[in-house]
Amino acid sequence: MRVNELSDTYLSENPLVRIFSRMKVNIAVRLAELKKGDLILDFGCGAGWLKDNLRKRGLNVIGYDIVEEQSDIKDYTKIKPDKIFAMDVFEHISKDEVKEIIDNFKKMNKEFELITAIPTENWVSKKCRKILGKSEKVKGHITPLKEILKILKSELKLVKKINFLSVSWIGKFKNI
């Protein structure tokens, strides 16, 4: 079993997939407006592509993933991050778990910012996946964008959103 299929997008042999994935992350990083003193949590860090790239920029990043070998810490709730990245994470978990995670984030630091990317899974997204030789329906996606946004907008303040090439929704939220 593969530990993290998402890292394949950042390192894909297909240059279009690689470029798309890296552009999406770069947009999210710019949206975050990171500063040297920030403590950053890469929530759902997977193989660590984002975490490693932010560390190369001299930033203080802690990665957390449900796969213990990929995490820097066992319990993400024990830190007080200024910025939290959840890139392509929430669609893989239930609505109740998304709500619980947001509640945890709010307890960790009252002034955190959340930067997230969520696939739209619209018809454009499905056709792009088909062109790339993949299934139109993504295996492992449990909660759709609409439901995730409903939770996020009820718990946090949306600061800015970007509809990236119609296939990914990128947003920055602040605690209210």
Model-derived features: positions:
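Conserved N-terminal segment of class I S-adenosyl-L-methionine
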Residues: 1-79, 83-85, 99-102, 136-150, ...
